Curated annotation (Swiss-Prot):
InterPro entries: Peptidase_M18, Peptidase_M18_dom2
Quaternary data: Homododecamer composed of homodimers and homotrimers that assemble into a tetrahedron shape to create a central tunnel containing the active sites. Homooctamer.
The protein's name: Aspartyl aminopeptidase
Subcellular location as annotated: Cytoplasm
Deletion consequences: RNAi-mediated knockdown causes a loss in aspartyl aminopeptidase activity, the rupture of the food vacuole in ring and schizonts and an accumulation of large lipid droplets and host hemoglobin in trophozoites.
GO biological process: peptide catabolic process; proteolysis
Species of provenance: Plasmodium falciparum (isolate 3D7)
Residue positions binding Zn(2+) 2: 324, 380, 534
Domain of life according to the entry: Eukaryota
């Protein structure tokens, strides 16, 4: 198990490093499914689905759904087994109007997404990841990018400048005033522009000019007028008359050229967006190989460029960003892929096994079901969006699958999609995976003594009688039994531990209850322990990754078998 656990953890870290945002996580999970034989679908096309086949669907590059239709999927004995997670994480996202200039420094205005431990983002090497929209000829192009090198930083205030006693932690961070990452100085921004325009800039290097603008966010327009030249943020104070005249002529020629080539673009060309930081646009234009003025909008997350890694003297831990919940979602999809591969192997080998009287690794009724794995966006901010868990996208996906797979039954027996769904839902189940809180050795008072979570002790089964978690004793027992059946077959234990928050502590919530309510389907909330949740650098244990992946696999493989043995004692 040690070797396999490390392999799983290594794969998870590689995935997380490549997934600096929700967009890239969706893209990378989609590629992972396609590499395992899943067929790509689009919402805007007619679905002609086949049994014993896997499919993958992305909605707006924010929500990913993989599913596999069992070869004997049927109305009478089949079920819908769903494992879910969320692919967003707390992050600093660049604002639409992000141009900030203070003390001869270009900064970026950002917005706090979710409830992050924002003080941990200070003094880190920050890159960018996300979605950019730009013009290319007559087309509007969406591009997903990730810049893994350090292009931004958020400096702390030096200890000597803080009005504090030696026992204070630090200055209190104001999220509006203090979280504005630095991208460049105004000097180097001007030098770069002059270099690109083949203009001599010796005067800039020898001039020590005080800027006359008011460094106040309420006077940003005045700021831009003092700092920008022809709406391109070139300082008039630092350029001589010839340089100004040269730049004016060059920009007018460029504008006239664009207008002449495309008369319809006149209004667009004449409007140069000064609300966006020019150094940021320059960076993005290099990445996209386009012009700055062609960039229309973006959704970009700041990300830590330091790679995740194994840690601890025995390398029993892993550390990195976005474990909540990319680590959980990786385990969801990995367990799902392993299940599908085992079904395919079972199908291809069952005739040979029957002839040679070989016992199959999995039970035959595993072919009777529809298996689904989903990664939602926007969990960190409440899930209320078209790609979040509160939407009806999951129910829409299931309805479309039923309509395609049971097309013949619907026509010949005059059945409705809702009738078929109503028959299936009674045997169906949701397994929601989201990270959990490990007992912190430095803050032992934060957890209930009877419900502590420990590293290497396995999956956390989350309970909350106020339904912040969807778990009930009945359904927790069903899942625990699947773990036992997995052990009976493979002789590998899937450890688990029960979790509940203190009565005097607010209980976090996740998407399990939301999806269960939308689908009228029972479920359970699970996860694995981690420390420093919502920090830019989080900690988890290697062996728990193994337990979670195998737990998802066991759920898919044995849930129906366990459910069939469940009886009510009269």
């Amino acid at each position: 198990m040690d070797k396999k656990a490390r392999e799983y953890a290594q794969d998870a870290l590689k995935f997380i490093q490549r997934s600096g945002s929700n967009f890239l996580a969706c893209k990378n999970l989609k590629e992972r499914l396609e590499n395992n034989g899943f067929i790509n679908l689009s919402e805007g096309e007619t679905w002609n689905l086949n049994k014993n086949e896997g499919y993958v669907l992305c909605k707006e590059n924010r929500n990913i759904c993989g599913f596999f239709v069992g070869k004997n999927f049927n109305i009478d004995t089949g079920s819908i087994l769903i494992s879910i997670g969320h692919i967003d994480s707390c992050a600093l996202k660049i604002s639409p109007n992000n141009n900030v200039i203070k003390k001869k420094i270009h900064q970026i205005n950002v917005e706090c997404y979710g409830s992050g431990l924002w003080h941990t983002w200070f003094d880190r090497s920050l890159g960018l990841s996300g979605q950019v929209l730009y013009k290319k000829g007559n087309k509007l192009v969406e591009k997903l990018i990730q810049i893994n090198k350090s292009v931004l930083f958020l400096p702390s205030l030096a200890i000597h400048l803080q009005n504090r006693t030696r026992y204070d932690f630090s200055v209190k961070i104001n999220y509006e005033n203090h979280i504005k990452p630095i991208i460049s100085t105004t000097l180097f921004n001007q030098l770069n522009k002059c270099k690109r325009n083949n203009v001599h800039h010796d005067t800039i290097l020898t001039t020590d000019t005080k800027f006359s603008h008011k460094e106040n966010s309420q006077n940003k327009r005045d700021d831009q007028m003092c700092h920008s030249f022809n709406d391109k943020d070139v300082s008039n104070h630092n350029l001589d008359k010839n340089t100004i005249e040269h730049l004016t002529n060059q920009q007018n020629e460029e504008k006239n050229k664009h207008t002449k080539d495309n008369p319809n673009s006149k209004d667009i060309v004449e409007h140069i967006n000064t609300d966006n930081s020019y150094p940021l646009l320059y960076l993005l234009s290099k990445e996209l190989n386009c012009k700055e003025e062609d960039i229309l909008d973006f959704e970009l997350c700041l990300m830590d460029t330091q790679e995740p890694c194994f840690t601890g003297v025995y390398e029993e831990f892993i550390e990195g960003a976005r474990f909540d919940n990319l680590l959980g979602s990786f385990c969801v999809f990995e367990g799902f892929i392993e299940l599908v591969n085992s079904i395919k192997n079972h199908t291809s080998n069952e005739n040979t096994n029957h002839t040679n009287n070989i016992t199959n690794d999995i039970n035959d009724n595993i072919h009777n079901n529809l298996y689904i794995s989903i990664g939602y966006d926007h969990e960190e901010i409440g899930s209320l969006s078209e790609v979040g868990a509160r939407s009806y996208c999951t129910k829409n996906f299931i309805d479309r699958i039923i309509s395609s797979v049971f097309k013949k039954e619907i026509h010949e027996k005059n059945l409705s999609v809702q009738e078929i769904y109503g028959n299936l839902v009674n045997r169906s189940f949701i397994l929601n995976v989201d990270m959990a809180h490990c007992s912190h050795p430095n803050y032992p008072e934060t957890v209930q003594d009877n419900h502590q979570l420990f590293f290497h002790e396995g999956i956390a089964i989350k309970y909350n009688t106020n339904k912040n978690y969807v778990t009930s004793p009945l359904h927790a027992s069903l899942i625990k039994r699947t773990f036992e059946l997995y052990y009976n077959k493979y002789k590998q234990q899937i450890k688990y531990q029960n979790f509940m928050v203190k009565n005097d502590t607010p209980c976090g919530s996740t998407v399990g209850s939301m999806v269960a309510a939308n689908l009228s389907m029972p479920g359970i909330d699970i996860g694995i322990p981690q420390l420093a949740m919502h920090s830019i650098r989080e900690i988890a244990a290697v062996h728990d990754v193994f337990f979670l992946i195998k737990g998802v696999f066991a759920f898919y493989t044995y849930y129906n078998q366990v459910l069939s043995t469940c009886v009510h004692d009269k």
